[in-house]
Amino acid sequence: MRGSQEVLLMWLLVLAVGGTEHAYRPGRRVCAVRAHGDPVSESFVQRVYQPFLTTCDGHRACSTYRTIYRTAYRRSPGLAPARPRYACCPGWKRTSGLPGACGAAICQPPCRNGGSCVQPGRCRCPAGWRGDTCQSDVDECSARRGGCPQRCVNTAGSYWCQCWEGHSLSADGTLCVPKGGPPRVAPNPTGVDSAMKEEVQRLQSRVDLLEEKLQLVLAPLHSLASQALEHGLPDPGSLLVHSFQQLGRIDSLSEQISFLEEQLGSCSCKKDS
């Protein structure tokens, strides 16, 4: 019974060794390891001279020897052919429980603060940490106070918002409300908003008035343009020059009429006398 148990254990050992050697095969993240051939032992017949005592003539003890032969072993000058051996490539190791699967990356130094090794020498850091081994804290408060409404307090790997004295943080963390109730809008004692609105309305009224005046100014020009075409003039400017000339003639005629009226008046006075 004991002999059969020993044979069974021997077979299990052979299977385990063979399974380990055959667990790896060339492939992804599995590399061939350079193996040296093992020395070969060979057997040979060794001649040995064995001394012994015997009885010679005259009943004397004599020493002589005899030749015997036995099997001996010696190392052969050659080497046995090396079998290919495989192992995980540098930077990778076996995944626990999966023989032959080299899926676990190795990071040296190891990743810190909850970081995971995703590739040899490369760590993936959780939120709040950075660096080659996730050793440095990220200062969330350096950019826009971390989104806090009033104060931002940076901690190792995280941050939190803090309100001024007399205020408390809202449930969603976006507002700091006065303790005892929601914030109320304080009246504006300076009346800046009202004055600004009045100024905007006043400027808008001026713009409307200027637009009306512009239309009044442009109306004669449109009329002049049509009249210039009627008089055969090339442009409204020529019509203006022509109109000014006519006005000059009218003024001259008015002066002459006034002079004639004065003369007529003086003549009537002399006739009456």
From Swiss-Prot:
A motif (Cell attachment site) lies at residues 130-132. Keywords: Angiogenesis, Calcium, Cell adhesion, Coiled coil, Developmental protein, Differentiation, Disulfide bond, EGF-like domain, Repeat, Secreted, Signal. It holds the Pfam family EMI. Residues 192-219 form a coiled coil. The keyword Zinc-finger does not apply. It comes from the Eukaryota. Residues 1-23 form the signal peptide. Residues 103-135, 137-177 form the EGF-like domain. The keyword Disulfide bond applies. One of its GO terms (biological process) is angiogenesis. Its main location: secreted. GO terms for cellular component: cell surface; collagen-containing extracellular matrix; extracellular region. Residues 27-104 form the EMI domain. Disulfide bonds join C31-C89, C56-C62, C88-C102, C107-C117, C111-C123, C125-C134, C141-C152, C148-C161, C163-C176. It is found in: Secreted, Extracellular space. One of its GO terms (molecular function) is calcium ion binding. SUPFAM superfamilies: EGF/Laminin, Growth factor receptor domain. Regulates vascular tubulogenesis in vivo. Inhibits platelet-derived growth factor (PDGF)-BB-induced smooth muscle cell migration and promotes endothelial cell adhesion to the extracellular matrix and angiogenesis. Endothelial cells depleted in EGFL7 by siRNAs display dramatic alterations in adhesion, morphology, and sprouting. The defects are in part due to diminished RhoA expression and impaired focal adhesion localization. Interacts with ITGAV/ITGB3 in an RGD-dependent manner, increasing endothelial cell's motility. This is Epidermal growth factor-like protein 7.
